[in-house]
């Protein structure tokens, strides 16, 4: 496996984010490589400190890692509010609008973001882009009527492919749905407009755009961490 050139940056971001966690918190665990480092950093604190927390995970992968490291997890059906969610992103533009869902967990990730009192996105410098869309836009779609949903997408100019897994079959999300990766268009200067158009298609479960009140911490290979906030109410 190719070594991640930003692994040290992700670890540094994760440790600083883990320092925000205090006893009594319910913590939302995102998905992806940066979130994995955050989960590990939380586990390190639990091993060294008398920290009383619970967590809820946005994906089976994050759940399994947290469970294996001894992080207490709650029933993911019954939480109403999360104190802090820490997650990553695939792309972030200058307005801190972002694309998430490269790992296929966008539906659950957005529920956690919606439920959280504080939303923190950790990103290395490679995730900062001038315009969203270069690496594609993941859309979670229903298996029922799959072909008709894709036809509706194509009819309004959104072209792509169903995501495949490592065995060559269709990638299935933790919710039993498909991921359709849109590659055309490949730039989204006004993602709010695209989000509204896409959500009008019945059968689209969730779209990878995140336009919300979030904090974003950008980590750089020179050791700097730049902390920004959308300022959206």
UniProtKB/Swiss-Prot annotation:
Pathway: Carbohydrate degradation; pentose phosphate pathway; D-ribose 5-phosphate from D-ribulose 5-phosphate (non-oxidative stage): step 1/1. Its EC number is 5.3.1.6. GO terms for biological process: D-ribose metabolic process; pentose-phosphate shunt, non-oxidative branch. The keyword Cell wall biogenesis/degradation does not apply. The active site is at residue 109. One of its GO terms (cellular component) is cytosol. Keywords: Isomerase. Substrate binds at residues 31-34, 87-90, 100-103, 127. It is an enzyme of class 5 (isomerase). InterPro entries: NagB/RpiA_transferase-like (IPR037171), Ribose5P_isomerase_typA_subgr (IPR020672), Ribose5P_isomerase_type_A (IPR004788). It catalyses: aldehydo-D-ribose 5-phosphate = D-ribulose 5-phosphate. Gene3D superfamilies: 3.30.70.260, 3.40.50.1360. Disulfide bonds: none annotated. Belongs to the ribose 5-phosphate isomerase family. Catalyzes the reversible conversion of ribose-5-phosphate to ribulose 5-phosphate. HAMAP family: Rib_5P_isom_A (MF_00170). Homodimer. This is Ribose-5-phosphate isomerase A. It comes from Chlamydia felis (strain Fe/C-56). The lineage of its organism: Bacteria, Pseudomonadati, Chlamydiota, Chlamydiia, Chlamydiales.
């Amino acid at each position: 496996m190719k070594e991640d050139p930003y692994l040290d940056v992700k670890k540094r971001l994760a440790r600083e984010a883990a320092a925000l966690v205090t006893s009594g918190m319910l913590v939302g665990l995102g998905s992806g490589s940066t979130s994995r480092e955050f989960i590990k950093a939380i586990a390190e604190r639990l091993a060294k400190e008398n920290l009383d927390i619970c967590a809820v995970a946005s994906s089976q992968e994050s759940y399994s890692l947290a469970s294996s490291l001894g992080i207490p997890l709650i029933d993911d059906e019954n939480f109403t509010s999360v104190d802090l969610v820490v997650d990553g992103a695939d792309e972030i533009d200058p307005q801190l609008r972002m694309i998430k869902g490269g790992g296929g967990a966008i539906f659950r990730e957005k529920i956690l973001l919606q439920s959280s009192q504080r939303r923190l996105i950790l990103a290395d410098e490679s995730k900062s882009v001038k315009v969203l869309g270069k690496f594609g836009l993941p859309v979670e779609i229903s298996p029922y009527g799959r072909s008709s949903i894709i036809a509706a997408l194509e009819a309004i100019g959104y072209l792509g492919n169903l995501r495949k897994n490592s065995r060559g079959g269709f990638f299935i999300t933790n919710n039993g749905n498909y991921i359709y990766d849109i590659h055309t268009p490949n730039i989204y200067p006004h993602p709010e407009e695209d989000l509204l158009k896409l959500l009008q298609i019945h059968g689209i479960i969730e779209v990878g755009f995140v336009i919300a009140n979030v904090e974003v911490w950008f980590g750089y290979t020179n050791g700097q961490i730049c902390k920004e906030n959308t300022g959206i109410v």
